[in-house]
């Protein structure tokens, strides 16, 4: 599995944790090692409409996708549900939690549980 992380001003330890999280989550979600070797994950950290989103890459096969883009808006993760400002490890845990959630969607795309329909709708 190839994992590329595009980010600025993110600590190296968090990037390493994100890379490890991808391998651990894909294997624990029941994706075989043979299939996992062919996966390409590109993680973009920056401003986005929501905290996280997982998509099939534009040039990937729509019916058997192997290339995915994951968008994480780490700026929205600074404040929790109670309007507390998250600092240090709390913020890192929130980023990893959101990444894990988006990796579940990647698993759904791979297994065909989530697929593209007409006009870009997901079903």
Question: Where are the regions a protein language model picked out?
Answer:
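Auxiliary, metal-adjacent structural segments of Zn-dependent hydrolase domains
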Residues: 12-72
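Histidine-centered divalent metal-coordination motifs
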Residues: 101, 105
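Surface-exposed beta-strand edges and their flanking turn/coil or helix-capping segments
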Residues: 16-20, 83-87, 121-123
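Active-site scaffold of zinc-dependent metalloenzymes
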Residues: 50-93, 106-110
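Acidic/histidine-rich, surface-exposed loop or edge segments in extracytoplasmic proteins
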Residues: 1-8
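Post-HEXXH active-site segment of zinc metalloproteases
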Residues: 89, 93-97, 109-123
